[in-house]
């Protein structure tokens, strides 16, 4: 995650400043052989031999199914945001035309029984027919130790209406989808090796995900780009209709491949799949009968073959605003601090006492870091976040100690970097971190000299007329003021004059520098004449944030289910991910830092800013990688506790975790929880003990 904000946010600020701104019978059958399923796409399906199950194992599996059924209907988490919330969001009439969790559970149990028995009923057998009310398509994913090894789907043809499927229509959808997924899994080299060693029981080792798609509904849009903006990527499926034939893209498949964010490309791919040229919608004639559709779906997934399933979405689960108690946020901040500290590792694994680096962006789908190590700008932001955490009395002592050690290690590495490998931003953030840590020589001296030279160069070059120049000035002023002796008083005052001009006349140019300016504005030694324009700048930032905040005036519990997980986020126009994401974290962290800087007696609170902090804290918590979302990947422990860049992507960039840690701590320090803004009726489970190993935390 870059410390820079996109041009879209700067443009929005500029506009404001210039305008005043039943388990089915099949689940009890384990005696069928796997016949070769007939694939619609002509794929060669390898038949699976008849299973030989022992009576003891069958009894054990029966107990697991009984437990799963009871858990599904009696345990709250599975239905926490199910039918009751769906009814609130879409009305009872919509409930009757969409697959329910009960229907999805029946499908899951039937498919699980077939996998455990290593046997699939023939399509002509009654056991293969699983009633799936209101379902027009089924997608099945199979994983081995978190790695996707098989996927299959089946779907009904698309009548030119939005009516749900008839009761008899979809009964073989599950059977066909499971057969195709298993056939693909058996072609996997690892599965083939396991099968050679264990025999016919290989499918019983696979974890299962079942997705039921509801009826197709028209997707309105003059162009592909226009239609794409109307889809809740990752939470809704999309389809291309050509005559009576539908070609669907399922959220589960898209998310598993980490391709859900580009709906426009998905539609283009579906057009090709339908045998159509990849051209835009207005270019198709009426005689071609081409249109777009969307569909809701429900997904059930288990992390292991013998685990109970849970309903999952692109976010994993929906974090309720009621969970945002002070205890929950403190536990989340402790988790982030521990995880971020654990991401600082020796640059050379053979030299544990040598220089330390910050790990790069984690790609959980491939279970690798891309790049392996973070850029200096990300390392500098991490050093600042860890330094701030090391001074926070809100965190457990062991977490603070580790945060201080890792922050100091990063500052030392940054100070030792040669000129071509670093930039002013890295030096300035590292310098502020060194002050927070109370570091002495030599790292601090090196940074002081660099910043002093950069200030003299900036003054000699004159005042530029772009956002990069304004950002550079803000970073230098903030770092020099924190260090105290990096520049002469005359040079510092001259640079401060330029910063005040930018803050008053060209505030949009300072969006990238919201974080260092917040540290400057929070400094108790800053003159009031210099603080006033900065305070006004953050009032503008807060006003813009409130204007762009998702779900303003509603709550996450009553929001549209398609996008309720984005409530509280800042919806930047033209965002690369297409949804509100963590790109706004640094600006919001600056707002929270300013609100936390002074007591109400010294500095009046900004009600607009404070009203945005708690909803955004929910949004941040929604992006923390926790269960059940992490269970769909190869290495949940490595992933758990990091922060996702976007809910429609899997990647966890280091800058997102750093900025999220700073934001949660600043929000706690601002006192908004003491304002009574947070609901106090959250369940005790919402306030877990703070983890110290960085691998577990709020679920």
Q: Regions from the language model: what does each represent?
A:
Residues 2, 6, 10, 15-22, ...:
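Low-acidity, Ser/Thr- and Arg-rich intrinsically disordered low-complexity segments
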Residues 64-75:
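Bacterial N-terminal signal peptides
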Residues 91-308:
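Basic nucleic-acid-binding interfaces
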Residues 309-377, 456, 614-640, 647, ...:
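Low-complexity, Ser/Thr/Pro/Gly-enriched N-terminal "stalk/linker" regions
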Residues 317-324, 380-398, 428-442, 472-486, ...:
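Well-ordered alpha-helical scaffold segments within catalytic/enzyme domains
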Residues 321-340, 395-417, 440-462, 484-503, ...:
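Extended, well-ordered alpha-helical scaffold segments
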Residues 363-380, 395, 412-427, 459-470, ...:
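Solvent-exposed loop and edge beta-strand segments that line ligand/cofactor-binding
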Residues 374, 550-564, 575-591, 596-699:
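CBM-like carbohydrate-recognition segments
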């Amino acid at each position: 995650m870059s410390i820079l904000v996109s041009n879209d946010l700067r443009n929005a600020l500029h506009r404001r400043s210039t305008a005043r701104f039943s388990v089915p019978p099949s689940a009890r059958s384990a005696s069928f052989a796997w016949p070769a399923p007939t694939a619609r796409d002509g794929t060669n399906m390898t038949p699976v031999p008849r299973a030989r199950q022992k009576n003891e194992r069958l009894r054990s599996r029966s107990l697991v199914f009984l437990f799963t059924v009871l858990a599904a209907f009696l345990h709250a988490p599975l239905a926490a945001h199910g039918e009751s919330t769906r009814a609130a969001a879409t009305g009872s009439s919509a409930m009757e035309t969409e697959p329910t969790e009960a229907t999805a559970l029946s499908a899951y149990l039937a498919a699980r029984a077939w996998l455990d028995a290593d046997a699939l009923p023939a399509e002509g057998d009654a056991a293969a027919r699983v009633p799936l009310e209101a379902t027009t398509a089924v997608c099945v994913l199979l994983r081995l130790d978190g790695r996707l090894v098989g996927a299959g789907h089946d779907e009904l043809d698309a009548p030119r209406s939005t009516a749900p499927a008839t009761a008899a229509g979809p009964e073989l959808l599950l059977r066909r989808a499971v057969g195709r997924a298993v056939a693909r899994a058996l072609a996997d080299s690892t599965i083939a090796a396991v099968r050679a060693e264990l025999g016919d029981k290989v499918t019983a080792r696979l974890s299962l995900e079942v997705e039921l798609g509801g009826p197709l509904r028209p997707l309105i849009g003059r162009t592909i780009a226009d239609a794409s903006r109307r889809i809740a990527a990752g939470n809704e499926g999309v389809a291309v209709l050509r005559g009576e034939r539908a070609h669907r893209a399922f959220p589960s498949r898209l998310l598993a491949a980490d391709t859900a964010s580009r709906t426009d490309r998905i539609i283009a791919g579906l057009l090709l799949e339908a045998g159509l040229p990849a051209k835009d919608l207005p270019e198709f004639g009426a005689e071609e009968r081409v249109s777009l559709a969307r569909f809701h779906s429900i997904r059930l997934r288990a992390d292991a073959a013998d685990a109970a399933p849970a309903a999952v979405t692109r976010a994993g689960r929906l974090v309720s605003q009621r969970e945002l108690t002070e205890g929950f946020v403190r536990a989340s901040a402790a988790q982030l601090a521990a995880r971020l500290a654990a991401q600082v590792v020796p640059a050379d694994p053979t030299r544990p006492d040598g220089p330390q680096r910050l790990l790069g962006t984690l790609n959980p789908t491939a279970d690798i870091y891309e790049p392996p190590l973070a850029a200096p700008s990300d390392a500098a932001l991490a050093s600042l976040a860890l330094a701030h955490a090391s001074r926070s009395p809100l965190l457990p002592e062991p977490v603070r100690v580790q945060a201080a050690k890792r922050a100091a290690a990063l500052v030392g590495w940054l100070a030792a970097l040669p000129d071509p490998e670093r930039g002013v931003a890295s030096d300035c953030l590292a310098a502020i971190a060194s002050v927070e840590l109370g570091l002495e020589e030599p790292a601090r001296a090196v940074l002081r000299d660099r910043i002093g030279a950069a200030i003299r160069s900036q003054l000699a070059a004159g005042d530029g007329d772009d956002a990069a120049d304004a950002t550079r000035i803000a970073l230098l002023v903030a770092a020099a003021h924190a260090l105290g002796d990096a520049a002469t008083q005359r040079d510092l005052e001259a640079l401060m004059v330029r910063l005040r001009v930018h803050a008053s006349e060209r505030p949009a140019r300072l969006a990238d520098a919201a974080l260092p300016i917040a540290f400057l504005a929070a400094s108790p030694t800053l003159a009031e004449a210099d603080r006033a324009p900065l305070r006004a700048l953050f009032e503008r930032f807060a006003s813009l944030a409130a204007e762009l905040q998702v779900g303003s005036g509603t709550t996450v519990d009553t929001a549209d289910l398609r996008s309720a997980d984005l409530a509280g986020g800042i919806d930047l126009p033209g965002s690369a991910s297409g949804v509100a994401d963590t790109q706004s974290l640094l600006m919001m962290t600056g707002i929270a830092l300013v609100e936390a800087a002074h007591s109400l007696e010294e500095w009046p609170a900004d009600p607009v800013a404070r009203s945005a902090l708690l909803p955004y804290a929910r949004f941040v918590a929604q992006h923390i990688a926790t269960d059940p979302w992490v269970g769909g990947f190869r290495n949940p422990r490595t992933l758990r506790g990091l922060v996702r860049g976007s809910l429609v992507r899997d990647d966890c960039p280091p800058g997102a975790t750093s900025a999220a840690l700073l934001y949660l701590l600043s929000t706690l320090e601002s006192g908004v929880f003491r304002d009574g803004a947070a609901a106090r009726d959250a369940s005790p489970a919402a306030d877990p003990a703070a983890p110290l190993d960085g691998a577990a935390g709020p679920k």
